[in-house]
Amino acid sequence: MTIIIIVLSYFLGSIPTGFLFGKFLKNIDLRLIGSGSTGATNVLRNVGKWPAFFVFIIDVGKGLLAVKLSQSYTNQHLFEVLAGISAVSGHIWPIWLKGKGGKAVATGLGMFIALSWKVGFASLGIFLIILSKSKIVSLSSILAAFFLPLFMFLDIGVTNHPYFLISLVVSILVILKHRTNIRRLIKGEESKINSLNK
């Protein structure tokens, strides 16, 4: 049963929310425009504010539901982590889109809200604070990911717990998925979210 839940979590994460919104609302393939990501930020820029909001909420739900599904079966922390990272992996490398998905920010957030709501909302707080000051989504995501392992350590107090280890893995993964954004940030060329009037 554990293997089934882990596999189901991957397929849950693989649901291409942003891609579907782009196709149905604007008949566009988000993989071919903007950042090429199917995440909420690319939806915001190319489809609209409200579609991006719903994509974000659904993508958060994918990570949260995967962990909650595992918790309904067992309370083993390692199993919860495996289900969560399976959903995150599905979001980044969805089978339906030949492995080209999002950057794991929203789905990772949902995963950590389910594992530790304090850590999840602390990371969300960092994201929102940086976004309000900088108007740069990528910078906000990178810094939220950077502080994630610290928040988890402060919450559980150890570094050999599956929760801390997965926070480290997801932090690195999210930052690596933003490599091109980091290069643009260094050059001062990263786009800002200045208008949300779509």
UniProtKB/Swiss-Prot annotation:
Belongs to the PlsY family. The chain crosses the membrane at residues 1-21, 77-97, 111-131, 136-156, 157-177. It catalyses: an acyl phosphate + sn-glycerol 3-phosphate = a 1-acyl-sn-glycero-3-phosphate + phosphate. The keyword Chloroplast does not apply. It comes from Prochlorococcus marinus (strain MIT 9515). It is a multi-pass membrane protein. NCBIfam families: glycerol-3-phosphate 1-O-acyltransferase PlsY. This is Glycerol-3-phosphate acyltransferase. HAMAP family: PlsY. Keywords: Cell inner membrane, Cell membrane, Lipid biosynthesis, Lipid metabolism, Membrane, Phospholipid biosynthesis, Phospholipid metabolism, Transferase, Transmembrane, Transmembrane helix. GO terms for molecular function: acyl-phosphate glycerol-3-phosphate acyltransferase activity. Catalyzes the transfer of an acyl group from acyl-phosphate (acyl-PO(4)) to glycerol-3-phosphate (G3P) to form lysophosphatidic acid (LPA). This enzyme utilizes acyl-phosphate as fatty acyl donor, but not acyl-CoA or acyl-ACP. InterPro entries: G3P_acylTferase_PlsY. The gene is plsY.
